[in-house]
Structure formats: C-alpha cells, structure tokens
C-alpha cells in the first residue's frame, strides 16, 4: 500500500520543510491524486525522501523584475516551490499587458496546470512549459533526446470556470513509472503511428526553454497576459456538457 493522504504533511515536515512549504507541497500532491494523476501525487513524497541533496531551507530568487520580463533562479529550492513563488508574484503584481518569466534551475515541477490555474481564476491567460531529464527517444528508437516536457495553458472565463489544458509529450510520465502505473520502456512520445508530432513538440519545447534559460540544468518558462476576449463560455455552450480540459 502506498502513502496515504493523512501521511503527506507529517512526511514532508520530517524532511525539514517549514509549515508553509509543507502546505504548498501537500496541496499540490493531494490535488494530483484527486484528479487521478497519481504520477504527480503522493508517490513523489517517497521520491523526495530519496534525494541526497535535498535542501528544505533553499529559497528561489527573483533576479530580474521588469514590467514585461522576469528571471528567477531556483537556487536549490524544489521546482514546485519555485513555481509557487513565481505564481504568487504574478498574482501580487500582474503584468500591464503581458510578461515572460524565465525560471532557471527549476525541477521538479509537477502538474503544471495546477500552478497556473490560480492565474486563470484571477483573470489572466497563462502558458507554462518546463524541461525534465532526457527520457524520450525519437520514434523508431535510439537514445533519449528530450524530456517529457509538459505544456499547460490556462484560459480564464467570466463564468469563473477556466479551461486548463495540461499535456506531457510522453505516452506516460516518469511519475507514472514511480507510482507503479507504467514501465520505463513505455516512456516514448505519445501518438503511436503519429508519435513524430509529439516528439517534434517535445524537441521544440526543450530548445525553447534552453534558448531562454542561461543556466545549465532544467528550467521553466511562463507567459502570463491580460486577456482581450472571453472565449470560454461560448466554447462551453458548444460543448453541451462535454468535459473540457481541466474539468473535474
């Protein structure tokens, strides 16, 4: 039997995280479980317990703060906590129109849609991608060239119910392997005969982040903007009750 929900906070506290960080991390893991995404859920706490270089006292740093651009450094903090700090900063001071945020040394990042959902609920459009260890080979086989490199997009709605699309480029995620829901050999681009499309997007996202991030290691890039229109209610009407991305 895996980790139980009531064990999440005590186990995180035992790793040395402060109460605020325990709550941030636990909320993310429990939300992932509630959405059926156990690869980003409680299994990750056991994974963190195996980290030899875990520094629960590390704090992300904002190195550049301009109206349309920010750069952050994880500075040894978990990527989850870096993204939480970045999102809090955008909510506290939204961009005049649009802002690009580049995050260096930001890993692991978890379920990206979770981090940008609050931005959409606050009336902002958001797009977030992040790199990860190279685990996806090209279709047809070969050495792994890219991470699963997820992409999440959140669109606000005047009805208060944003659409949040969150897709990994892998047929499964590394988290699914950690949670025992998939085998390592299943880490290939999704799409079967059309896997070249997911692989192309994984490569594009990898290079996009790498080109903007001046540091070695894994990074994330967030675009946050004020919307000029309100397309979600119309789409929901057309959907006639069908589930849209991010719905529970």
Where are these regions (language model features)?
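Catalytic-core signal marking the mid-to-C-terminal active-site face
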Residues: 2-7, 217-248
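Acidic, glycine/proline-rich low-complexity segments that act as flexible tails and inter-domain linkers
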Residues: 6, 10-21, 25, 38-57
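Flexible, glycine/charged-enriched surface loops at secondary-structure junctions
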Residues: 19-24, 38-42, 214-222, 243-248
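Active-site cofactor/substrate anionic-group-binding motifs, chiefly glycine-
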Residues: 41-91
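A generic, well-ordered mixed alpha/beta core segment in the N-terminal half of proteins
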Residues: 69-142, 152-155
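Phosphate/diphosphate-binding glycine-rich loops and adjacent basic-rich segments that engage nucleotide
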Residues: 134-186
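Small-residue-enriched flexible segments
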Residues: 165, 171-213
């Amino acid at each position: 039997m895996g980790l139980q929900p009531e064990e999440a906070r005590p186990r995180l506290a035992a790793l040395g995280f402060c109460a605020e960080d325990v709550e941030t991390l636990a909320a993310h893991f429990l939300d992932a479980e509630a959405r059926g995404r156990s690869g980003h859920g409680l299994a990750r706490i056991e994974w963190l317990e195996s980290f030899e270089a875990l520094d629960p006292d590390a704090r992300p740093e904002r190195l550049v703060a301009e109206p349309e651009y920010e750069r952050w450094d994880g500075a040894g903090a978990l990527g989850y906590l870096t993204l939480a700090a970045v999102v809090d900063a955008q909510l506290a001071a939204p961009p005049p129109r649009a802002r690009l945020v580049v995050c260096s040394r930001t890993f692991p990042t978890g379920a990206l849609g979770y981090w940008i959902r609050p931005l959409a609920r606050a009336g902002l459009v958001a797009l977030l991608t992040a790199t990860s260890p190279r685990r996806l080979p090209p279709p047809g086989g070969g050495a792994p060239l890219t991470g699963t490199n997820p992409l999440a997009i959140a669109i606000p709605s005047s009805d208060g119910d944003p659409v949040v699309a969150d897709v990994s480029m892998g047929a499964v995620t590394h988290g699914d392997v950690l949670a025992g829901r998939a085998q390592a050999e299943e880490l290939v681009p999704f799409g079967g005969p059309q896997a070249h499309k997911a692989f192309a997007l994984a490569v594009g996202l990898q290079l996009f982040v790498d080109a903007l991030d001046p540091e070695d290691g894994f990074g994330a890039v967030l675009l946050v903007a004020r919307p000029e229109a309100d397309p979600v209610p119309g789409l929901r009407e057309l959907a006639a009750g069908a589930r849209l991305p991010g719905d529970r």
